Amino acid sequence: MAAMTAIALSLAPLVSASAAGGAPSMDANTDITDQTSLQSGARVFVNYCMGCHSMEFMRYSRMAQDIGLEEDVVAKNLMFNTDKIGDSMTIAMQADDASGWFGVAPPDLSVIARARGVDWLYSYLLTFYADSDPARPFGVNNLMFPDVGMPHVLWPLQGVQSYVKAERPADVDSEHIEQLEADDKGIRVRTAVTTKDGKTTHVLDMLEVTTPGTMQPGEFRKAVRDLVNFLDYAGEPAKLVRFEMGYWAIILLAVFAILARALYKDYWRDVH
């Protein structure tokens, strides 16, 4: 219980800050029964997220079993902080050091998908963009989480993304993002702009990759989807068992219904 409380408190700044602003989420379309996706997501998590974020409720051995990897493969490719397959996915970084470097200790991500939802996480990881404001400590901002304090750790894959805004009226009073939509060039940002006289116009902004990374936009979105899929699985591994049991339960009920129908017809054959 103490561990759950600590994680909930560590996630509180993320939840409250994102709730105060941001944009509507895009659909993540994850599927935790897709083992190939889970394996890809685990690889991205270990290589790009686990330098700062732990996942202490997940053990390497459980992960290997659930996502279809041999333990020796996990030990060779996904374990860098321990040599014991039964250990939890913790990190070497100390919370005090992290607070000094980032202003706040990066949260454990064991239940982040349950706290924020897969659609929000997917959209958040796709909408980092370069921000030259000196107040931005890592030179980036985020549409889902304005004034984010986290660096864009996936930039080697995505590249540097710029927020290209369409022309606005001169007397803008307020504006808000209505929809995000991914395409081959980047992410279309449909924005409603209200002027001081109360009139609202709609403009189309863009998030565009201006300095390419190692992946094309479609490839990067797939990598992010796989990562979010893995985070969704990690938040509740028992869902995999429930899904499998559910399939068998449906099959059993279907067979029972067929047998019950046949028995019913046999009982009433002479009556009719």
Give the positions of each predicted feature:
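The canonical Cys-X-X-Cys-His
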Residues: 45-56, 227
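Bacterial N-terminal signal peptides that target proteins for export
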Residues: 1-7
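Electron-transfer interface patches adjacent to heme c in soluble/periplasmic c-type cytochromes
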Residues: 68-183, 205-220
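Extracytoplasmic/secreted proteins, especially bacterial periplasmic and envelope-associated proteins
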Residues: 36, 40, 44, 116, ...
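Juxtamembrane interface at the cytosolic side of transmembrane helices
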Residues: 242-272
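Electrostatic cytochrome c docking/interface patches
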Residues: 17-43, 54-65, 235-243
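C-terminal segment of classical bacterial N-terminal signal peptides
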Residues: 7-17
